Amino acid sequence: MSTTMKVMQLLPELNSGGVERGTLEIGRALVAKGHESVVVSNGGRLVPQLQQEGTRHLQLAIHKKSLSSLFKVRPLRRLILQEQPDIVHVRSRVPAWITYFALRKIPQKNRPHLISTVHGMYSVNAYSAIMTKAERVIAVSDSVVDYIHQHYPHCPKSSIVRIYRGINLKEFPYAYQPSAAWWNTLYQLFPQLENKTLITLPGRITRLKGHEYLLNLISELKQEFNVHGVVVGGADEKKQGYLDELQQRVVDMDLQEYVTFVGHRSDIREWLAASDLVLSLSTQPETFGRTTLEALALGTAVVGWNRGGVAEILNRCYPAGLVEPENAEALFKKIHQLLATPMPPAPVQDFQLSQMTDQTLALYQEVIGLR
């Protein structure tokens, strides 16, 4: 049997986000090891990068959450028969359903092996259950493993493999400092941030991210510390109303000089490094918490709720940042303590990108019996 393998990853689109990033990372790792990498999606702005890194992209509209997506079953089956991948790796629910029906009419002996990754703690229903119906189910954290055990007991424990997502520490070097040019541009755009202690809440603008906690914190802390709250992340059209609501709340609380919304940024590394504290205050458990990890890798302290993937990262890398979930008083005390007596995190040793890619490729090879 040949030691090279062909892997086809499927996801809705290739624009931005953790699922997309992970797809590119695995594609890159496959190509680097001499394997063949194919991605099927509806396309997006990351396609040129994907192709530049050696992965072939096949465009198919497998992104719509509607019954019309079932019309893509036959075209996908044709693609699979044409490409003959060893592994089909589904990373989202709509592509998983289309793949499920596409594979059913392929004879067992000609069928590729099916792997899924559960990237999120989806709403619990039959639609989401498809993510647990693969030969191997990758969970991106122990919290996701627990979620699968609890809500999908039919999924054999032996099928579930926990593979943490990881980051490239060369991209997030410890004690990294933004360039003088970056600081100059920052102060030109946002002069109100100069000489301030920056407390940053990164992430897209949604009700789940805990912005209210940030506003209340800044309102209390500004009486004692020279703080400024920074919200890094944009709002899509559907969430624009919530952003307007938050900005009105800032006015109502008289915090215009103490909180800044900087919108979507491509220079997140610089913002995390420039921050004195980064917060992770989602109202629901995070499946992993990549931004928490990126901030810690750079040497920036992170404070977050003691639950979900963020707690797994903080427990290993910065336990001083853990706070009882939804406890506003404990949160204030913790941040007050860290502002009064800063405790920078030690260099991160775990959650490296190479560990994630090596474990995933090893799983592929195990499933197709190459080892």
For each feature predicted by the language model, list its residue ranges.
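Short hydrophobic beta-strand element within catalytic cores of glycosyltransferases
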Residues: 39, 301-304
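A conserved mid-protein helix/loop that constitutes part of the nucleotide-sugar donor-binding site
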Residues: 17-25, 197, 201-222
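A short helix/loop element that forms part of the nucleotide-sugar donor recognition site in Leloir-type
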Residues: 173-192, 245-247, 342-344
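Active-site donor-binding acidic/aromatic loop of nucleotide-activated sugar
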Residues: 238-244, 256-265, 271
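Conserved acidic donor-binding segment of nucleotide-sugar-dependent glycosyltransferases
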Residues: 316-328, 336-340
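Glycosyltransferase donor-sugar binding loop
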Residues: 40-45, 202, 228-244
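A conserved, positively charged/aromatic
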Residues: 108-142, 154
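Short His-centered aromatic/hydrophobic patch
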Residues: 90-96, 118
